[in-house]
């Protein structure tokens, strides 16, 4: 018998014993009422469920903002041991850094993480493995990194508790922030995912960084899309960026303004990198060079955009290895943040750089190179560029990055696509070992 049963209903007073028959009647009546109300409640819940519209349309891609905060298991001695091992600096020099790479299972994140590890830096990856594109490709990238001793934590930049835990266990000197909702056209289908990842996620990360001691220096991925509807080329960091052509571009522009705010108020050292059409092995399936390759091999027709009056659409295609060199140079030249305890103690570094190839190539030329590499003739369909956020021309002025980062791209499109095609054929033929080379 529970000790609670010994306590009288009115302490200090005599409790009159009730008739057992009356007790049974009331008990049966209570059961009847309970059954009735349970049935009523069940019917009400069923009705509400049937009348509620589905939160995600099954015929369209699911919302990454809903997927990314799913519960993941983290914590515990074994988990913390893996973190510390991955974060350990293994270089003989005294200038090694410890970096948190967000979006580490993404295209650029994978290559940057691997390059940092190769030179002996400590690296922890963070990725939510959402299904904006095939998650199996992201997991293959993770397997590649883990063979090099890099631990990729499965989690989201909007998970504040996870971020706090990571910074509590590891004293990061730098953050390489590459996590984002990518893609210009997808923003028309799922706009909320861009605000969730590219704005809210960035703010969450900066909030954690400003509160830790010491504060890390932060390098983050902006985008060439911030130049929007500018017609003056090549694009320079001094040009206006107040006419974004897509929601994606607007969120990246917002990120630059947010960075300025946190630099000004909290003394965070921040460097933004405006990437220009990155391509190469382990790339993103939503990029034109990638799905062109897939469709050409399958004998499907590919659509090539034309700008107004049958004008040429061209991109400043930049090979992944050149982008990685720029990222590492930005990390190496980043000055320390000046804040402490969430308060600014002095002026802090704030920079933005273009990372491009400086040689725009018409998309039609890209297709011709792919045809030669694949030894397959493409079925081409020329169509007018839709108003979906794409712009007809991109061209980077990289003089600032050359001067301050020593940035010098060396890979032309033909050489880069040859490497991509070799990787693509190896990976999708099932030869993962050859693809990893």
Curated annotation (Swiss-Prot):
Optimum pH is 7.5. Active from pH 6.8 to 8.2. It is found in: Golgi apparatus, Golgi stack membrane. The chain crosses the membrane at residues 30-50, 96-116. Keywords: Carbohydrate metabolism, Golgi apparatus, Isomerase, Membrane, NAD, Transmembrane, Transmembrane helix. Pfam families: Epimerase. Active between 20 and 55 degrees Celsius. One of its GO terms (cellular component) is Golgi cisterna membrane. It is a multi-pass membrane protein. Residues 56-76 are annotated as: Disordered. One of its GO terms (molecular function) is UDP-glucuronate 4-epimerase activity. Involved in the synthesis of the negatively charged monosaccharide that forms the backbone of pectic cell wall components. PANTHER family: EPIMERASE-RELATED (PTHR43574). This is UDP-glucuronate 4-epimerase 4. It comes from Arabidopsis thaliana (Mouse-ear cress). The lineage of its organism: Eukaryota, Viridiplantae, Streptophyta, Embryophyta, Tracheophyta.
